[in-house]
Amino acid sequence: MLQSDIRKPSRLITKGEIDLISRFNILTPLAIAVLILTHAVGAQQPAIQKPAEKKAEEKATESAQKKTEKSVPPPVVTSKEIAKTATAEQVAESSILVYGGLIGGRQTLNQIRKTAIEKGKISVTNAEGKTEQATYQRWTQRAETLAKEKIRLELDFPNARYSLIFNAEKIFGIHEDQAFTPREDAARSFENNIVHGLEALLRYKENESKIELGAKEKILGVEYYLLDVTDKQARKTRFYISTKTFRVMMLDYQEDGRKFRRRFYDYNYAQGTLVPYLTILWADEKIIEQSEVGNITFGQKIDEAIFNAG
């Protein structure tokens, strides 16, 4: 059974709240407990005031309230009110914070995911409608921007084994230690997985991409923020971000008149960062790819020679 959007209580996160969480996430519960305890003790031991003292105190309180009336800060805006006027940046940054484990956000992702080694299973349906099964292994060397990353995807089919490599914005293949030029459709599919993937959102600032927030949309009872991310090559990806969890549940992009939709399921945490363990890709409402992560680790040393041609 495919996992749908997990409806956990969540809300839009402001930059001010991020600072408060990081600075006072330990002290705040203690402070609240002290305030509650103080209030309880005070309630149990009420002070007895004389009529004259009570009137004098009321006058002093009224005078103090008038003096400070102009300096009282505006009321705190609730999460529901923020959600009504959410900006593209607020939605994007809130989602990044969730994927980074709620505390570090972008900083945590950069620290933990310096490298990634992923293993799993994949099924691919070709243009003739034939589905092939394979195991895969993926190595990623993180860089300042998505375009500068180094990625190697090794595919092991029953009758063939080869690798596709993304390095210096170029794509080439390796078969039996020999470099080759992959078919155009295979190279394009590999590239789309990179430029139209989750990292396009999580690293929109580093990539200098433009973001635009559209109207919210409800699909099968689940409400989404629709966030468009367009990179410097004018490649646009629309992300459907849950208004409850701020997880990306699916994304859309178009190419050569075809509409592609990638859905994400089975979210779980790996080394404190959020990862979808099941991904399904549709092309014109037909499933053409399904991948399932078996194991993923971050931060391990990778020999950069594997990203070279031979």
Give the positions of each predicted feature.
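Bacterial N-terminal signal peptides that target proteins for export
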Residues: D5-L30
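Bacterial N-terminal signal peptides
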Residues: P29-H39
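Compositionally biased, proline/threonine/alanine/serine-rich low-complexity intrinsically disordered stretches
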Residues: A43-A86, S95
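Gly/Pro-enriched, hydrophobic low-complexity segments
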Residues: A52, V222-A309
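N-terminal mature ectodomain segment of secretory-pathway/periplasmic proteins
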Residues: P75-A179
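Flexible, processing/modification-adjacent segments and terminal tails
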Residues: V76-V91, L97-G100, A168-R235, E255, ...
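Well-ordered beta-strand positions enriched in small/hydrophobic/aromatic, beta-favoring residues
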Residues: E118, I151-L153, I171, I211, ...
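Short, ordered beta-strand-loop transition motifs
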Residues: E144-A147, A215-E223, A270-Q271
